[in-house]
Amino acid sequence: MPGEFYVENKAEKVSLETVESSLAELNTKADAIKVRTDNLAGENPWQGATTADWQTVEANVVSIGAAGIRNKIHDLTLSIHNLVGTQIRVRLYKKVNGTERKVYEQSFDATSDPVGLPIINGSWAIHGVLRVTLQSNNAADNGKAVDYDYMLEKMLS
């Protein structure tokens, strides 16, 4: 009969239902693993540029993520190739216990540092918005574009 087999040297029938059930369970688990590993490729790269009066006041370059959504940022690169200031301050802000806080600040010199700045080089997990700002000490930087590029990966629960 289909679904049954005989064990050698035994006259009794053994059902394959347990084996079939176990295989179905394994298929379900394999599908769940595939969904998670497919996510490892991350999203398409995010790229853009922001124009602002960088010397007048600290201005937003980009906001990454969304409230209540868990992400990993694998790379955040800014390009200051259009700027001429000798003190280009990059700051990152995120909520800590419900209040936005500055969590990173570094100064660069557009006249001597590389024009591509690897602000995040590695993985950084966030569960809300990461706000990236920039400020220059040179009025000639007002109205200039600052390019950005980042890689994001949604974290599954």
Tell me what each language-model feature is.
Residues M1-N44:
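Fibrous stalk/shaft segments of extracellular and virion attachment machinery
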Residues A11-K13, T51-W54, E58-V61, E100-E105:
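Tryptophan-centered short beta-strand motifs
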Residues N44-I69, N82-Q87, V115-G116, A140-N142:
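Surface-exposed ligand/attachment interfaces on beta-rich extracellular proteins
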Residues A49, S136-S157:
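C-terminal interaction-tip segments
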Residues A59-V96, T133-S136, M151:
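Beta-rich globular "head" domains
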Residues S63-I64, S79, Q106, I119-G122:
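Beta-strand-rich interaction surfaces with strong enrichment in secreted/lumenal proteins
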Residues N71-L76, G122-V146:
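Noncatalytic modules at the cell exterior or secretory-pathway interfaces
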Residues Q87-I120:
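Terminal beta-strand-rich extracellular "head" domains
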